A protein has these predicted regions:
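Non-catalytic cap/lid and distal C-terminal segments of serine-dependent acyl enzymes
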Residues: 1-208
Length: 208
């Protein structure tokens, strides 16, 4: 895009930066892009080396993700701001599936950098079976498991920024969405408990 609100697009599980276009998402929102309302910055993931790298310890997986976190915040964000000619610009985070996890996690950890999130069909806790983390390992990844750490956030600095942000979380109700529905409901509950405005949308039973 040539102008508009910047979005960082996180790919789905083990995905690449070009997947968003390959899955038809660019075409679907082309009207907004061409009208100068939004501009997209699609990034690679390191899921294969972090949360899905079952060959290494939880600590190593967490450390790899933290390196990715620094890359996004310290390198990608400055690039986006320079590109937008807006040195204080807060960007939006967007993603589907594992990309939704990243979109929510980055927003919650860095609300001074991210203005909000649009997350679609994500899992928001790292104790899900697909991540293969034991109960003993979970404390070491606590601060990257949104449904874990969000419950304990009471710092007014974070809460005030959350309440002034744009939060949209959607999930289908079709096949394979059970865990995503459960996590979305829990996220919705936590937002309500903390008086954080959010648009939570449950799509049809034909959507997955």
């Amino acid at each position: 895009g040539h102008w508009g609100k910047p979005f960082i697009i996180f790919p789905s599980s083990r995905g690449r930066y070009f997947d968003y276009e390959g899955m038809g998402m660019i075409e679907a929102i082309a009207g907004f892009i061409n009208a100068g309302k939004i501009k997209l910055f699609c990034v690679d993931s390191v899921d294969e080396a972090s949360w899905y790298n079952y060959a290494v310890s939880a600590a190593d997986r967490n450390a790899r993700h933290e390196a990715y976190d620094r890359y996004i915040v310290e390198e990608v964000i400055p690039f986006v701001r320079h590109h937008c000619q807006s040195p204080q610009e807060r960007v939006m985070a967007n993603g589907c599936s594992m990309g939704a996890y990243h979109a929510v996690n980055f927003f919650l950890k860095h609300p001074d950098v991210f203005e909000g999130t649009i997350a679609l069909s994500g899992l928001y806790r790292l104790d899900r079976p697909e991540f293969q983390l034991s109960a003993a390992e979970l404390p070491g990844v606590y601060f990257n498991s949104p449904l874990s750490y969000l419950a304990g956030i009471d710092d007014p600095w974070y809460l005030d920024l959350y309440r002034r942000s744009k939060i949209i979380v959607c999930v289908g109700q079709g096949a394979w969405e059970d865990e995503a529905i459960e996590d979305t409901r829990r996220l919705d509950s936590l937002f309500r408990e903390k008086s954080i405005p959010a648009w939570i949308d449950y799509w049809g039973h034909d959507v997955n």
